[in-house]
């Protein structure tokens, strides 16, 4: 059996050495042989067992898996979503809508692997090839018809979706993130664009034309469908934002549709349109899709609302400058009282976005409490220094302990105020140093206000 984890090798297995971001499988070849590997596939070296040298083991693995499981792959429709923000909500809405329409659909992404309303936690937004194919086989056994995936820039850069072909791809937006991995914004853009070169000949490419980089994803070789407030295939004519819903008029060809989304936020209009267009691209009538609209909801940690007296507490995953700006602008459109924000930045990650997020939070909030997100192995004081280094306002304080920060934020609420707790969303853990402990923002809020 072909395996990429030396620890799982048993007698007679073939070990394939993959180079990752942190580790290189070539460093574990000897261990794999000791564990019983009878064959090694790698890019370099000489070993005491049968050895196949190939130019790129990741390319080899992708072709091997595609050839081996062609029957299973051909039974699915694949939908891939990429972008800085909105991937999870867009993909999760597609998962819900298609299942409500009677098309058995699985979801793979940030919040896990969903099939038959069961959830399995994942380590990465887009798993590696071996794990991905395990999920595909599980989907095949369960008669899944459509697989909707979040496709991250990491996955595209590292070849985790090599040789897959998509029936529908969608671009949500592009803003600063992951520069610690890609090195430059241009590299980040190039990584995202790779998904749009993986569309089947009869596939559909869905593009947010309002995004400043939208035109970079309009490839002539694709059948492009655009959406946005600007003139587009699916055009938003007007909208009205409320704390618990969003109303807007949608123009498609010569038809107009008045839509009431049971989820708030201007950005969720965009996320919903990705889901709507994906369903239509698979052959559903737009009016049939809209009939299911009352049945959808956002995933955990995406604008999770907790009512507290006359106030509203919102837990959200917003952890990039653009996501933070979008959620703050949205709540400012319907706030009646003050807006308080609790936010931090992850450690051992892109430092350049920290002062930007600090500026956005203090500009659009009445008051901000900066706190720990997942500091990991980075000094928490360094993270805070980066966040506040350019601030000349005094409408903020720093409370490193996240639970104490949430307690303080709740204590500030008076009447019809809004408290945003940003950055972690669905996560039920906090990483400090190398220790991962249970921590769930929503649980903490409910415990405090009970």
Identify the meaning behind each predicted range:
Residues 1-63, 67, 212, 235-239, ...:
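N-terminal leader/targeting and accessory segments in enzymes
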Residues 61-209, 213-223, 279-280, 334-335:
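Phosphate-binding loop of NTP-binding sites
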Residues 33, 42-49, 142, 166-313, ...:
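Acidic, Mg2+-coordinating active-site environments of NTP-dependent enzymes
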Residues 38-44, 205-209, 342-343, 366-374:
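Short internal beta-strands
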Residues 8-14, 20-27, 277-287, 291-301, ...:
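ATP-dependent carboxylate-amine ligase
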Residues 47-48, 112-115, 155-157, 212-216, ...:
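Short, active-site-adjacent cap segments at secondary-structure transitions
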Residues 12, 37, 48-49, 102, ...:
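Short, well-ordered alpha-helix to beta-strand connector turns
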Residues 44-45, 110-111, 153, 174, ...:
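Short, ordered loop/turn segments at secondary-structure junctions
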């Amino acid at each position: 059996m072909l395996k990429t984890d030396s620890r799982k090798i048993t007698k007679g297995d073939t070990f394939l050495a993959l180079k990752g971001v942190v580790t290189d499988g070539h460093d574990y070849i000897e261990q794999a042989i000791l564990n019983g590997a009878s064959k090694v596939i790698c890019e370099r070296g000489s070993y005491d067992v049968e050895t196949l040298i190939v130019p790129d083991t990741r390319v080899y693995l992708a072709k091997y898996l595609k050839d081996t499981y062609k029957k299973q792959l051909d039974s699915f429709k694949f939908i891939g979503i990429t972008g800085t923000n909105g991937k999870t909500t867009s993909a999760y809405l597609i998962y819900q809508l298609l299942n409500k329409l009677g098309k058995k659909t699985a979801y793979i992404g940030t919040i896990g692997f969903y099939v038959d309303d069961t959830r399995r936690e994942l380590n990465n937004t887009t798993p590696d090839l071996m794990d991905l194919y395990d999920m595909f086989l599980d989907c095949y056994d369960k008669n899944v018809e459509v697989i909707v995936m979040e496709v991250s820039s990491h996955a595209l850069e590292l070849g985790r979706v090599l040789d897959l072909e998509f029936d529908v791809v969608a671009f949500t937006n592009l803003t600063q993130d992951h520069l610690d991995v890609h090195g430059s914004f241009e590299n980040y853009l190039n990584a995202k664009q790779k998904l749009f070169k993986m569309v089947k000949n009869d596939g559909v490419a869905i593009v947010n034309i309002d995004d400043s980089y939208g035109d970079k994803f309009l490839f002539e070789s694709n059948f492009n469908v655009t959406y946005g407030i600007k003139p587009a295939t699916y055009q938003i004519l007007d909208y009205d934002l409320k704390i618990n819903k969003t109303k807007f008029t949608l123009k498609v060809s010569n038809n107009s549709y008045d839509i009431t989304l049971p989820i708030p936020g201007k950005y969720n209009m965009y996320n919903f349109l990705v889901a709507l267009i994906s369903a239509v691209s698979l052959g559903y009538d737009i009016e049939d899709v809209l009939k299911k609209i009352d049945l959808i909801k956002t995933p955990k940690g995406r604008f999770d609302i907790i009512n507290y007296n006359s106030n509203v507490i919102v837990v959200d995953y917003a952890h990039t400058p653009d996501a933070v700006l979008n959620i703050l602008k949205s709540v400012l459109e319907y706030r009646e009282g003050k807006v308080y924000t609790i936010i931090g930045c992850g450690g051992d990650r892109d430092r350049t976005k920290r002062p930007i997020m600090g500026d956005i939070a203090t500009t659009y909030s009445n008051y901000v409490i900066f706190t720990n997100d997942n500091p990991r192995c980075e000094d928490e004081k360094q993270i805070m220094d980066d966040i506040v280094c350019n601030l000349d306002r005094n409408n903020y304080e720093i409370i490193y302990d996240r639970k104490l920060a949430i307690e303080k934020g709740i204590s500030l609420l008076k009447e019809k105020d809004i408290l945003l707790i940003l950055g972690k969303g669905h996560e039920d853990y906090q990483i400090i140093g190398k220790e991962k402990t249970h921590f769930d923002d929503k649980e903490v809020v409910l415990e405090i206000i009970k």
